Amino acid sequence: VDACYEACMHHHMNSDDCIEACKNPVPP
């Protein structure tokens, strides 16, 4: 899970949306 958040901070300045996606992963 940490990797997901870290990726958000590295790839997205506003990790707000990214973090939400991390909490609610979308099925492929």
UniProtKB/Swiss-Prot annotation:
Family of the protein in this entry: Belongs to the short scorpion toxin superfamily. Potassium channel inhibitor family. Gamma-KTx 2 subfamily.
Keyword Disulfide bond: yes
Biological process, per Gene Ontology: negative regulation of voltage-gated potassium channel activity
Post-translational modification: Contains 2 disulfide bonds.
Keyword tags: Disulfide bond, Ion channel impairing toxin, Potassium channel impairing toxin, Secreted, Toxin, Voltage-gated potassium channel impairing toxin
A GO CC term attached to the entry: extracellular region
Organism for this UniProt entry: Pandinus imperator (Emperor scorpion)
Tissue: Expressed by the venom gland.
Protein name: Potassium channel toxin kappa-KTx 2.9
Functional note: Reversibly blocks voltage-gated potassium channels Kv1.2/KCNA2 and Kv1.3/KCNA3.
